[in-house]
């Protein structure tokens, strides 16, 4: 029992995956087919609204279906000629989503009117109104299905185009930075030479400072040695002179040498 259920689930999952893979492979062609189908449905609904003279509601009149036809023709132009233009795709998706919102609003409007008639009116006099609002709801349901089916692949394609444009912008910025770096090697050499000259000047200045400090230290040391030698010579001369002078001159109270 459980094995049969699991087998059925596997088969269903496999079929869903096959359909998904098929849609992904032929996504661009299916998108074009959806747009063509949208044009056909809008022409049919427009012709029905014109023949039946539906002028009772803004969202279910002939000019609403005419605007839908114009938008579907614009979608054919976009997908067959400008399929990589993100701005036109963005405009088409916004307009199509606006029509989908108005169609859903009109569906709730007419379905509400139909429920009111079915719940309040029991006599045969309301059969005409009942049939009228039923036709309206069926047309709006068909339009909502077509617009919803057409909106999803268009939105996914718009997202893909925007991602590709972002990647291209990033690659262009990287290439521009690389080109500027390649085209201006002289600036790099000049900056490198300036840095080398600055470093060499700093090294030379430091060496000169070291040499100057060592020279000054040697000079002061030699000068001190010379002064010390002069002082020693002066002291020795004083001693010699004091020994050579007579005692009377040295000291008046000193006795003469016998």
Swiss-Prot record:
Its main location: membrane. The keyword NADP does not apply. Residues 237-258 are annotated as: Disordered. It comes from the Eukaryota. Keywords: Membrane, Transmembrane, Transmembrane helix. The chain crosses the membrane at residues 33-53, 59-79, 88-108, 140-160. The keyword Transferase does not apply. One of its GO terms (cellular component) is membrane. It is found in: Membrane. Coiled coil: none annotated. Residues 242-258 have a biased composition (Polar residues). It is a multi-pass membrane protein. This is Uncharacterized transmembrane protein DDB_G0276999. It comes from Dictyostelium discoideum.
